[in-house]
Amino acid sequence: MENPRCPRRPLAEKKARSLDRPQAPGKGSESWDCHWLSLPTAPSRKALHWTTSDWARHSDSPAPSAEAHCTTAAAPTPEETGDFLPSEQRPSQDTKKGWLKTMLNFFVRTGPEEPREKASRRPRGKEGISQHPEPLEAAGEPALRKKAHHDKKPSRKKQGHKKHAAEVTKAAQDQEARGREEGLSKAAAALRSGEADLGPARRGGEDSDHQSFLIKVDGTGALDVSPHATGHQQEEELKKPDQDAIIQMIVELLKRVGDQWEEEQSLASQLGVALPNPAPAVRKKSQEKKTSLKRTSKTNPKKHGSEEAKRGAADVSSPEAWPPKKSSFLPLCVSGHRPSISSSYGLEEPKVQEAPSTEAGAPGPSVLPTPSESQEPGEELPLDRASEYKEFIQKIISMLQDAEEQQGEEQPQVQQEEVGVENPAPHCRRKSQEKRSSFRRAFYHKKHTSKEPRRAGAAGAASPEARRPKRPSFLPLCVGGHRPSTSSSLDPEDLECREPLPAEGEPVVISEAPSQARGHTPEGAPQLSGACESKEIIIQKLVALLQEVDGQLGQQIRRHPSFKRFFYEFSDSSLSKLVATLRSQVAHSSKLDRNRARRLYQFDVSLANKFAGSNSHAMCILMGLRDHYNCTQFPYREDQPNITSPKVESPD
């Protein structure tokens, strides 16, 4: 079988090659087994083929045959080939350039391709041999293979068919030459650009225009590329570690940034935990001072608020005095029915009142010290005493409310009776008057409380020195209810003696604030003023009346005399109202007791009118009916002559 890479050559070609064999540097019988090739950098379009004259000179045949004619037809024109070298060098140069083109095609990946027409015209019997392309085919091989093909089949083809095939092969060769020329130009440009990138230092000072591209071809087909290709590979190998180093640096930078971010997050979390820590004591006190000022400005008048603010500012320096004064800023009762008192009356306030305060030297009320009063401030009251104290306060407040309601009802009733006597009205009009009177009762206290601060302000403008002791008189009464509002400050400094209200309704004149230790002896205490004496007398009367009216309250006061101090929180007018109410209750209870005792002996009054006769007046006196029935209704004078008449029969 014929080898596609080594086709059978004619005898004339072998003789021509034998003449040039001493000049070629080949090792074997054929010149293309192993050669050292040198390619100039500039591309060339010279196609080295054997012409007709060369065949005639080197061959021993007498005349050129049809094969020479076909070879001549397949050879390129002189314009394409250009100047030819001497005939002695042509075989070696042909093989060199053929190998060079095949290697360039191998690098550029543009191998020679046969046209489809030529492949389709091949006989079917030899498709298995020639179906693979021949990438390592030399430039002169198509013509030689064409000649051998015509030698084998001279009888099958005619001359016209040979001419047509020669034209087709010529066109295919031209196309292949153009493609190879373009590939060579691209390869040369790539080599020049690579040499320009390497520079004179890496290429060893050699000129890029005269640098050769050496290829060593062994019989096995191994290739050894020149230093330019190795330089590109070394450059790529040098660039790769740089990229790895850059990637490693980026990774390290990211690690550093991540560590820094974690540290910042940890610091931020620590700061966030440290921020909600409690503020300093000074800041807390300033905040409490602001809240206390807001409360006093809403509930109390401006003057009272300014004094409390001054007191609060003074207490900031002494933190020990701050907690007991917290309760003094509780708001007053504005619309309720009970005065605003501290929620810690039963537990904390008795201790605060019993605590000795040596700073205030004002005299206090003359209350004899008792063992229960001389307790230490650190002792805690038992729960039963605290509950009793709360019950006592509630009862006193309810009694005071009843007293004010009774007093408020009496005056409108008197006015209504006077109007009813002067102008008698029908029953429906009386009902409307009763409704109006109920409205008058509701707004009665509101009118009086609004008048009192005005009068107090007018009276205090003339005497500025008296404004300070008149401070508690500005505290309004419970507007919506019927109970007086107690002082919101329950400290020992605010316990003051008050004088009773004058007849014309002027505000109470308050003396100096008493604050004296309960354990002190009354001998060393200064003499009390008339206002304090009058208030103490009122309190004593009130205690006595409470013992008479309600035995439970009397027992509580006897067991715990310290409960009397609660009465010092009320004004004199409130205490006087409470005393009057208790007196009326005592009188009413005594009358009820007498009536109950007398009702056992009561009988029908008509019987007295019928049978008593002249003794009816005496009967009324004896039976105790003088208070409830008017004795003038008995017809004493008119019935006296009828007694002697014989028609009247005595019950006897």
UniProtKB/Swiss-Prot annotation:
Signal peptide positions are none
Region span, Disordered: 1-34, 53-243, 259-494
What are the TM regions of this chain, as residue ranges?
Answer: none
Compositionally skewed regions (Basic and acidic residues) per UniProt: 10-20, 111-129, 173-184, 233-243, 304-313, 382-393
- Keyword list, A-Z: Isopeptide bond, Ubl conjugation
* Family annotation (InterPro entries): BNIP5 (IPR031362)
Biased region (Low complexity) positions are: 63-79, 409-422
Ranges in coiled-coil conformation: none
> According to the UniProt entry, which residue ranges have a biased composition of type Basic residues?
145-164, 282-303, 427-449
The UniProt feature for the cross-link Glycyl lysine isopeptide (Lys-Gly) (interchain with G-Cter in SUMO2) gives its location as: K302
Q: Which Pfam families match?
A: CF222
The record's PANTHER family line, in alphabetical order, gives: CHROMOSOME 6 OPEN READING FRAME 222 (PTHR22435), PROTEIN BNIP5 (PTHR22435:SF0)
Tell me what this protein is called.
Protein BNIP5
What gene is this protein a product of? BNIP5
